[in-house]
Amino acid sequence: MNYKAPRGTHDIFGINASGMSWLEQKAKVIFKRHGFEEVRTPVFEDAALFMRSIGQTTDIVEKEMYIFEDRKKRKLALRPEGTASLVRAFIEHRMDVSMPAGRFFYMGEMFRYERPQAGRYRQFHQIGAEFFGSSSPAADAEIIILAQHLLSSVGINEMNIYINSLGCEKCRPFFRETLVKYLGSVRDLCEDCLRRLEKNPLRILDCKTDSNKFTAVPRMSDYLCNCCKDNFSLTQSLLKSVGYNYTVDERLVRGLDYYTKTVFEIRSDAVGSQCALAAGGRYDNLVGELGGQDTPAVGFALGSERVLLAVQKTGFFGSFQESEKIFIAVADQELFSEAFSFAVKAMRNGLKGNKNISVFGPINGKSLTSQLKFADKIKAVKTIVFARTEFEYGKFLMKNMKDKTQTEFLISEF
């Protein structure tokens, strides 16, 4: 008998295995520079975890999950995505109480019963990051920047960022009601849309079959509450402040039910027509819904095979070393935007040619004393302080966290 890899799976060896290792090493460097720590979770979990978090009416749960029973009749599932498992670990190990401001990344195999095609498999590799404990739009902006930074670091330069706001539990029901009324007037919806109309109408906006029929579809932006409007507006302002171009796509809804407020995709023509290479968004309710302490969060993931197709199997694979932790603080909160821009620049380019660094901060709305305590807690080697007096002379203070000495530097030198 001739045995072959099951349909939708593939063996990775030679240049492809080297490319996978290279991509993962690149990702670790970028994640550590942004202050994220690695977490590894099991490849299978209680099936109910994914049903509860991803959503009973999503395509993943209804059609794509690999579910099985063990010898004790426990219903288990191979993980279809990484966020639910990481949130489960975050709660189980009491990190929602002991370290609610956590930054974590993961990489590993995921499993979905999908139709195999270029860059899409039933067993595939995913790289992702989750930022817990911040409801600030700065966290949304940083996650989008992080995803773009990772893709650009492996040579993908032609890409487009698409963003949207899905609102929250307060304003989304009003949009849902209006959308259902509108969709009820659209004739000849496809089978998937008819099924979603009753269970998950927002997903209809993402339908590739019927999209040309939705000529007068309601706009989510018209139904956002003031809080969601302000959140989305500030996210856009922060992206603009660091020179990031983006497009607001009001039909961008994502395929997972846990998303709230900001969602995004980064698309490229490198693999197919505007194919999504990375995607994510905010999920402020998921930790609480899974039994943890209410904790806002935002994250993203990318498919490794699809990204490697986009970089066309490069033959150069880098190495990485432990990085030096740098914290960015603000003595005057009015300088937060300038400090944020400086932090993003340092994350992208390093400091004076030194790229082996991890950059943390700035923290919005905290006193300088609190920020310095945080710098000590994360064992930062140096803290860069943006203060009004020095900033007016184009300078900042660099504080050595070991001997507490500090030196002034011109911002332009960095």
Swiss-Prot record:
Signal sequence region: none
Protein name as it appears in the record: Histidine--tRNA ligase
Family the UniProt entry places it in: Belongs to the class-II aminoacyl-tRNA synthetase family.
Listed EC numbers: 6.1.1.21
Annotated compartments: Cytoplasm
Subunit record text: Homodimer.
UniProt GO BP: histidyl-tRNA aminoacylation
One MF term in the entry's GO annotations: histidine-tRNA ligase activity
Originating gene: hisS
Source organism: Endomicrobium trichonymphae
Reaction it catalyzes: tRNA(His) + L-histidine + ATP = L-histidyl-tRNA(His) + AMP + diphosphate + H(+)
Main localization category: cytoplasm
PANTHER family, sorted: HISTIDINE--TRNA LIGASE, MITOCHONDRIAL-RELATED, HISTIDYL-TRNA SYNTHETASE
Record keywords, A-Z: Aminoacyl-tRNA synthetase, ATP-binding, Cytoplasm, Ligase, Nucleotide-binding, Protein biosynthesis
PROSITE patterns: AA_TRNA_LIGASE_II
GO cellular component: cytoplasm
Pfam families per the UniProt record, alphabetical: tRNA-synt_His
SUPFAM superfamilies on file: Class II aaRS ABD-related, Class II aaRS and biotin synthetases
